[in-house]
């Protein structure tokens, strides 16, 4: 509004000021000009008084309202609000008035309000400068001042000091762990995280201690703006210094915790890399020791009394300064000395407790302490073991033997590293466990590679050549598996059994129903469950076909007539030279044996109608003919008995039999056979 706009009264102020310049002082006139009608001597004081009155009555209220508006607009912006309130209070408190501060505040605000109008800005600045030359005391708005002070007091003094510390410390060089880990520091990843320079030992000594006290004094100097005293009583000082250290060491610990949490050992791509990494960690310039040295140097601090004494000395230095600031500093120095053992130390104590376990890993000469030495010895053994496994033309076989031994309980350097690491504090414990775990994973991977080669060369190749896509594994195949091939593959000490015993058995366990991979440290061979399932099928097939003779397939079974259509007079089942003839009447089971010795296993079922007409089915493809004939029949478990019901349908004529095997699982239940499919890779 015009009542608030200083620009609106600028012409009037200019006119009033120029009027004071019309008459020169009498001392500046020639002698003849002083005589006669010259009225300057009595007029100049009147004009000046009028101009000063306009400055006080027109310009000053507008400036005050201008400042009040800025205060209201920035109640949520503490830094701006503090400057606005300070300038506003200077209008009403001559004892705290600083002309340069007021001039700067108004010049900045007018530049914002009247951007581009340099002439008007210059004119207003000149008028305000003349206003400052005369005494005045503007009646401030106590309600607004109280509101502003309440807003300012929402942020504690310690937070203000800490905020200023952080802002002023931005010029400090940033800290990165990777710049201090030596030539082999690349074994660590994530060590490039930036830590602000304030949160280092150098930042603590050269900035926090050196600048903390002076910032307290600078802020205390503004306490009059808050309506508070510029000195601190013992309780206030204790609280302030305690809160400042709490804020600082809380963030200090957070920065170092976060930086260390990002550090990890580089992932391994081979056992050679694992050997190199273990070797680097125990080398003369071990990056692990270098990292621990950096942690200790930057997270080990003086005791509470020593720390406070340093702050006291800093305050005492400033106390030697002359003037009000020196007096305030002297008060702080005196009170700090008296309270040296009373400042709360919770945040610092927490930081020291957090990192003390890492400090203990080093001796006073920055070497490995007795807590760390066993781990370094275990790492040396691991380096040698991994190097041995990764060398030579038979490295895969050596790795396979190593994995087999460890899976079966033999201790190794990997176990020693795990045991030693478990006694160390994190994150060192995590790093070394990761090294051991990654190395073990690589060992298992190389063992799998070796095992997969053996599998493809010794088992899968035989399977594809002799069994794959042949009957009885494929029900509709026209090609039968040679009985000799079947025998050599599935018999005890046959192809499948030898492969399992030689290569797989050390790595698996059997719970009575299925095979499971054994694991150590939560890891097992990276092979698929499919192969284990197929090894289970091998066992099922062996128990069904080789129960009578471990070296030859042999099935003894009995066939018992169950029912015959009334239109049939008899049914004749034949396997080689073995026969069961059934007519209506007493049921007499017959014993059979497969494979049949005669007629190459020719199998048939012939039924005869009452009229004498005969019809039937016959299979003569070799020893698997019996199974092919049974495949033409409907099979189902017979309720209440461990037998299969065979239901033959020959042109609508039905004959049913009960098939009883002396072994379990029933070899004529071909579920395991039909599900037997070896994958191309483990």
Regions found by a protein language model. Give the residues of each.
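C-terminal domain/tail detector
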Residues: 2-682
